[in-house]
Amino acid sequence: MENVVLVDENDNRVGCINKIDAHLNGDHLHRAFSCFIINSKNEVYIQQRAQSKLLWPGYWSNSYCSHPRPDEEISHAVMRRAEEELGIVINEEPKFLYKFQYKEKYKDVGYEHELCHVFVVFTDTPPTENPKEVSAGFFINIKDVQEYIHNNEEFCTPWFKKEWADILQNHFDKLC
């Protein structure tokens, strides 16, 4: 089982913990990332998380998200997971947008308590979803993402909703 990096509120590494243990209670702030894939038509790829996921299975979310390994730079993890989840090889450095901290409980199953780095990748490579990670996915015009979230709020992950709201308010100019 993989380990994730425990961090303090300033994103300083303070240790490592088993990935499952990190999500069982809300005590373990750990480093994570989310990435939005945007194509040349200004469409954003949105994925439905696999039903086998521990937290928020079957929910709609950003293009992909994960955790860097303890010995891995976050940008490298963004590139690695694009290939593992979506079959997309990224040859350019992903564009960092911002980072934020959040804590959310999923039913009686567990928590996300992350210091999340948000990235964007521009590519026209079509995704080939790994069924262990992704149940479905589609591209949506960048101008329609907020309406999609609003109309499907109860089926979207909490970090997707938080990230897109922040992107609209503070980072939208970096997406086009």
Curated annotation (Swiss-Prot):
Residues 28-162 form the Nudix hydrolase domain. It catalyses: isopentenyl diphosphate = dimethylallyl diphosphate. Pfam families: NUDIX (PF00293). Belongs to the IPP isomerase type 1 family. InterPro entries: Idi_bact (IPR056375), IsopentenylPP_isomerase_typ1 (IPR011876), NUDIX_hydrolase-like_dom_sf (IPR015797), NUDIX_hydrolase_dom (IPR000086). The keyword Membrane does not apply. Its cofactor is Mg(2+); Mn(2+). It comes from Photorhabdus laumondii subsp. laumondii (strain DSM 15139 / CIP 105565 / TT01). Pathway: Isoprenoid biosynthesis; dimethylallyl diphosphate biosynthesis; dimethylallyl diphosphate from isopentenyl diphosphate: step 1/1. The keyword Isomerase applies. Mg(2+) binds at residues 65, 85. GO terms for biological process: dimethylallyl diphosphate biosynthetic process; isopentenyl diphosphate biosynthetic process. GO terms for cellular component: cytoplasm. HAMAP family: Idi. It is an enzyme of class 5 (isomerase). This is Isopentenyl-diphosphate Delta-isomerase 1. It comes from the Bacteria. PROSITE patterns: NUDIX (PS51462). Mn(2+) binds at residues 23, 30, 67, 112, 114. One of its GO terms (molecular function) is metal ion binding. Binds 1 Mg(2+) ion per subunit. The magnesium ion binds only when substrate is bound. Binds 1 Mn(2+) ion per subunit. Its main location: cytoplasm.
